[in-house]
Amino acid sequence: MRVGVLTGGGDCPGLNAVIRAVVRKGIEAHGWEIVGFRSGWRGPLTGDSRPLGLDDVEEILIRGGTILGSSRTNPYKEEGGVEKIRAVLADQGVDALIAIGGEDTLGVAKKLTDDGIGVVGVPKTIDNDLAATDYTFGFDTAVHIATEAIDRLRTTAESHYRAMVVEVMGRHAGWIALHAGLAGGANVILVPERPFSVEQVVEWVERRFEKMYAPIIVVAEGAVPEGGAEVLRTGEKDAFGHVQLGGVGTWLADEIAERTGKESRAVVLGHTQRGGTPTAYDRVLATRFGLHAVDAVADGDFGTMVALRGTDIVRVKLAEATAELKTVPPERYEEAEVFFG
């Protein structure tokens, strides 16, 4: 049996750990040939692939990024995309695919399964916003990176007695902002799920200044002010219809400075949250996902995604996995509010 594996969407720490697990178990437990498709769904569209043997994955566990490359290619936006993939798989003798990605990559996997192509999904997103799994790998590393940045920024903020606004990733879900903000002792946390009042933020900030402390504000890139809209870096859309967010941190820092008369700075963590070595937790979770994805392929259980429920790895239908996003519930945000101001 020949099994293909690909990584789609934004990169994140832990992708190589999944690939390593798929190759090791696929070859050693089943005697399969493993084919790595390059650049996400672009690989199966164009036939761009490489064989993956045990030596190819020997040293990749601790590496960030993905040895296969990634892209935001959407085969359903390509003329004859499905038939091109079907032809490539037939030409290369690939019997099944393991697709590692977030909502967009898994959405394509679900459609391909409906079109008769055998696909098993592995959830990947630093945003942790897939509802069918308790956690996705990459999230823990992103929170760790953001928390460390907050710790470092606090000392410079205190030295200059200024407000520091830290913008983190999170288009629709504020899990990184919530977890990193709590772990870093932020004085204000702003998430996409809760439109914020600029007046309230300023009140919290001034309360900190009155106590001679430098306030730390953590804001997700998708957070919006009441009655406002998302701040866009560019209006251009990718193949899945997403615009590029960014800039709410700078906008808010300017508002704070203007309304308080105090110095305020914005720091956008950006792609540092996606890079570098995965945490131990993400390495283990990604490895377990890869092992169980191989089991799903061996069982012919296509149209499913491996997921974490409690401490167990289970399988869920791709239709369930892509039906909705997991956003921060009101009660979780309210837990953090006791620390605001």
From Swiss-Prot:
GO cellular component, one term: 6-phosphofructokinase complex
Family recorded in the similarity comment: Belongs to the phosphofructokinase type A (PFKA) family. Mixed-substrate PFK group III subfamily.
Leader sequence residues: none
Marked site (Important for catalytic activity) residue numbers: 124
Temperature dependence: Optimum temperature is 35-46 degrees Celsius.
EC number: 2.7.1.90
Important for catalytic activity and substrate specificity, annotated site positions: 104
PANTHER family assigned to the protein according to its UniProt record, in alphabetical order: ATP-DEPENDENT 6-PHOSPHOFRUCTOKINASE 3, PHOSPHOFRUCTOKINASE
Description of pH dependence: Optimum pH is 7.5 for both the forward and the reverse reactions.
Protein name stated in the entry: Pyrophosphate--fructose 6-phosphate 1-phosphotransferase
Lineage, highest ranks first: Bacteria, Bacillati, Actinomycetota, Actinomycetes, Pseudonocardiales
Reactions this protein catalyses: beta-D-fructose 6-phosphate + diphosphate = beta-D-fructose 1,6-bisphosphate + phosphate + H(+)
Any one Gene Ontology molecular-function term assigned to this protein's record: diphosphate-fructose-6-phosphate 1-phosphotransferase activity
Catalytic-site annotation from UniProt: 127 (proton acceptor)
Cofactor(s) recorded in Swiss-Prot or TrEMBL: Mg(2+)
Activity modulation: Non-allosteric.
Residues that coordinate or bind Mg(2+): 103
Record Pfam families: PFK
Keyword list, A-Z: Cytoplasm, Glycolysis, Kinase, Magnesium, Metal-binding, Transferase
Assembly mode: Homotetramer.
Induction: Present when grown on glucose.
Taxonomy, superkingdom: Bacteria
Residues bound to substrate: 125-127, 162, 169-171, 221, 265, 271-274
Record pathway: Carbohydrate degradation; glycolysis; D-glyceraldehyde 3-phosphate and glycerone phosphate from D-glucose: step 3/4
Protein location: Cytoplasm
An individual GO BP term: fructose 1,6-bisphosphate metabolic process
